[in-house]
């Protein structure tokens, strides 16, 4: 319920995440810093990756075997075999990276509760780099809600 004295605010920042090739990067703390900077206490945080060969997922952040198993599963589901794909201009890992991105997400929406991300105990927000080479990935964090 929104009180009549509530002030609505929107805030947006672009995070740059350096990857070291294929890997998952938990960046909860960077997102939380944006939420805190916004001053929003109750609202919604939208996170969007500006690339077609990387994606975002919310996944378990406690047991690294979960992330390893996900990576193995996707490697088997979408193999990096240059003979399978027409698009290979940027390398044999490029089209598989596009497919992996299409099968996952480019955005996530997280409630803000009492000025904090409303994630569960074991949840982490991960940038998933699908390419083999290092990249600088841009992630837009948009926060809106009551202050």
From Swiss-Prot:
Q: Name one Pfam family in it.
A: UPF0047
Q: Which domain of life is it from?
A: Bacteria
> Which InterPro entries does the record match to this protein?
UPF0047_YjbQ-like, YjbQ-like_sf
Q: Which SUPFAM superfamilies match?
A: YjbQ-like
Q: Which PANTHER family match?
A: UNCHARACTERIZED PROTEIN YJBQ-RELATED, UPF0047 PROTEIN C4A8.02C
Annotated NCBIfam families: TIGR00149_YjbQ (TIGR00149)
**Which family would the database say this protein is a member of?**
Belongs to the UPF0047 family.
Name of the molecule in the record: UPF0047 protein sll1880
In its UniProt entry, the species of origin is given as: Synechocystis sp. (strain ATCC 27184 / PCC 6803 / Kazusa)
């Amino acid at each position: 319920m929104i009180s009549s004295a509530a002030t609505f605010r929107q805030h947006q920042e672009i995070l740059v995440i350096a990857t070291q090739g294929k890997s998952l990067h938990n960046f909860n703390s960077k997102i939380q810093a944006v939420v805190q900077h916004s001053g929003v206490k109750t609202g919604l945080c939208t996170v969007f990756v500006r690339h077609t060969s990387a994606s975002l997922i919310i996944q378990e952040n406690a047991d690294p075997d979960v992330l390893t198993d996900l990576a193995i599963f996707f490697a088997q589901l979408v193999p990096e075999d240059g003979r399978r794909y027409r698009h290979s201009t940027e390398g044999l890992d490029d089209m598989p990276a596009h497919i992996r991105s299409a099968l996952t997400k480019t955005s996530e929406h997280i409630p803000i509760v009492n000025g904090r991300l409303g994630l569960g105990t074991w949840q982490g927000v991960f940038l998933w780099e699908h390419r083999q080479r290092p990249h600088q990935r841009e992630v837009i964090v948009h926060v809106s809600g009551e202050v």
